């Protein structure tokens, strides 16, 4: 099942479509752009069904996935072990679980660059 459908089924009212509350944390639906010029979470006025994230690493030997996990761990000031790639290991469309975070925590961290 595609990441967007997964989020739509599990999302609670009032949250951005890319964010899903789960037991023990939250999940993010992410569209990853490898081989970008910078590592960044793309700022958007209105978030879509997926959070767009760019990494400089190529999509080879899981390098882009590792860069994604590092970037999210830095942004959310947590250990890399708290960031789990749940689905989409070989796709640009991914589901990431952030263990120990609330939806409010995530939205606050995304708002503060």
Residue spans of the language-model regions?
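Contiguous, often N-terminal, cationic amphipathic patches that form binding interfaces
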Residues: 2-69, 78, 84-85, 89, ...
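C-terminal catalytic core of tyrosine-transesterase DNA break-rejoin enzymes
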Residues: 75
């Amino acid at each position: 099942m595609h990441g967007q459908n997964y989020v739509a089924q599990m999302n609670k009212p009032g949250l951005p479509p890319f964010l899903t509350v789960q037991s023990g944390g939250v999940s993010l639906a992410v569209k990853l752009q490898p081989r970008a010029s910078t590592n960044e979470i793309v700022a958007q006025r209105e978030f879509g069904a997926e959070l767009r994230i760019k990494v400089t690493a190529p999509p080879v030997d899981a390098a882009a996935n590792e860069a994604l996990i590092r970037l999210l761990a830095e942004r959310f000031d947590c250990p890399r072990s708290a960031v789990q790639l749940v689905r989409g290991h070989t796709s640009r469309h991914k589901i990431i679980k952030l263990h120990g975070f609330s939806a409010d925590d995530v939205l606050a961290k995304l708002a503060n660059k």
